[in-house]
Regions:
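C-terminal structural segments of small proteins and small subunits
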Residues: 62-90
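Short S/T/G/P-rich N-terminal loop/turn motif that feeds into the first structured element of a domain
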Residues: 1-53, 59-70, 93-96
Length: 96
């Protein structure tokens, strides 16, 4: 079964609230087998809308990544991100 990538592009508008999101989300992602590959590092924007924070996490499968997003723990995290950020998130299955 191929692994999956969780790719988020984020503009933070409230650092205090977003830091609560990040702490809880980090735990939820780990609980579902996710590991961070990139998290807020340097980047070059080539196309589309610029977001200054970019995050990539790898999960064991598309199902695991989706289960993480739908989990109560991650939804708790999202309650802190709403109103504290503008976000785009896509989950993509990796090519085998």
């Amino acid at each position: 079964m191929p692994s999956a990538l969780w790719i988020a592009h984020v503009t933070v508008t409230d650092e205090a609230a977003y830091s609560k999101y990040a702490a809880i989300a980090t735990e939820a992602i780990a609980e579902h087998g996710g590991v961070f590959l990139a998290r807020g590092g340097r980047y070059v924007q080539k196309e589309g809308r610029d977001h200054p924070r970019n995050v990539v996490a790898r999960f064991p499968s598309l199902d695991a990544a989706n289960a993480c997003y739908e989990s109560a723990r991650y939804q708790e995290a999202l309650s802190h991100a709403r109103g504290a950020s503008e976000r785009d998130l896509v989950i993509v299955e990796e090519y085998e």
